[in-house]
Amino acid sequence: MSIKTIQLGDIAIANDKPFVLFGGMNVLESRDLAMSIAEKYLEVTQKLGIPYVFKASFDKANRSSINSYRGPGMEEGLKIFQEIKDTFNVPLITDVHEPHQCAPVAEVVDIIQLPAFLARQTDLVIAMARTGAIINVKKPQFLAPHEMRHIVKKFNEAGNDEIILCERGSCFGYNNLVVDMLGMDEMKQSGYPVIFDATHALQRPGGREDSAGGRRAQATELARSGMALGLAGLFIEAHPDPDNAKCDGPCALPLHQLEAYLSQMKAVDDLVKSFPALDTSK
């Protein structure tokens, strides 16, 4: 197995490199909040020496309720992303939901994300691939790890091999997700960079009357377990007031705990990647 390295400017994304943080907020709530959250992430990651990519969504198109907040939309969202990029000189990742969004988003954003619920939509995959951007594929909650190869093959055949695979939990009965650590290792065998969405994996889908619940109190334990696998990156969302966040607050980290949280993740990553490779199949 060869390990694929994706180069994003001076950031190397690979399973054998120091982990990259893909972090920010769930959805753009306002320009000012996005700027302040990006500034906090950048301050902490620079202090800890962690490569960093800012994440937020301009539209949450799969909310539980039609009345739930979705975001500012693509046009306004891209303006905010451009300002964050210009102000902080930080790369960006965001998700798209329709083929027509791909080209304009790729003009501003460095990594385009394929949402888990849409990962088998061929027209969307082709449109994303044709931008030439780096692609982050969220593993659907309903697919086995080995089935990710079909999605990767679609991207490859559409002309794009700059692919990151992201674990975000698997359905376990009703209203619950679990994380299969061996499944993440299985995805690593593809050679592609694997990252762990440790906060969305805390979701309890449909856990509230009209929105998803979550288990924020277990955010540290779950992320440490994932980092022990030796991954290319960690994907998290934080908020200064999670209980009043407009989307997925029950899963969001309190922003004031970001430095302490990431210090632990970096320590685990550094330790695991200092070990020599050990093949126990022989």
Curated annotation (Swiss-Prot):
Any Pfam family: DAHP_synth_1
SUPFAM superfamilies, sorted: Aldolase
Keywords from the UniProt entry: Cytoplasm, Lipopolysaccharide biosynthesis, Transferase
Compartments where located: Cytoplasm
Reactions listed under catalytic activity: D-arabinose 5-phosphate + phosphoenolpyruvate + H2O = 3-deoxy-alpha-D-manno-2-octulosonate-8-phosphate + phosphate
GO biological process, one term: keto-3-deoxy-D-manno-octulosonic acid biosynthetic process
Any one GO molecular function term: 3-deoxy-8-phosphooctulonate synthase activity
Major localization listed first in the record, in broad terms: cytoplasm
Protein name: 2-dehydro-3-deoxyphosphooctonate aldolase
Origin species: Shewanella amazonensis (strain ATCC BAA-1098 / SB2B)
Gene expressing this chain: kdsA
